Amino acid sequence: NHAWYGIVSNLKTQLTENLNLNLGLDLRTYKGDHYRQISNMLGLNGWYETRRLFNQDHANNIPGTTVVANNTVTQYMPAEPWKTFFNSIDDNQKIDYDYSETISYGGVFGQLEYQKNNVTAFFQGAVSNQSHQRFDYYDYESKYSDSEKVNNIGFNVKGGGSYTFSEKHT
């Protein structure tokens, strides 16, 4: 299951006869749930699995400290394309992986443009941040299931201009 929400907005205004301002905003957020489930038991009554859970150091093989999880799966959802959008299975009936992810993005930009006679010039800048975090319900001990939230900040600044020598050349 995935859910995207967001807004993109733009404002363009003429400040003077020769000066235009363009401002924008882009906000988005995403929440996704990712897991695997059985679609056909192929005649079996159930599926049993044992797995070693990861700790805060992402290790699952330390003697004496490794936590083991056991899981018995008895439910399945037939692989019918349109039903997969709406089906829901109990957490203890998931196999292989089960995690959620949240991604958020925010950005603003602005551009100032000057134009008079044969001269045009502009200055543009933008800043954005994308953050993401994973919540692993399957492979980690519950107290370590939330990953660190990571932020990726970006920006740009540009400027430029042109002079028109004639109608055919700039």
Features from the language model and the residues they span:
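Short alpha-helical segments and helix-capping/turn motifs at coil-helix boundaries
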Residues: W4-N10
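Signature of Gram-negative outer-membrane beta-barrel scaffolds
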Residues: L21-T170
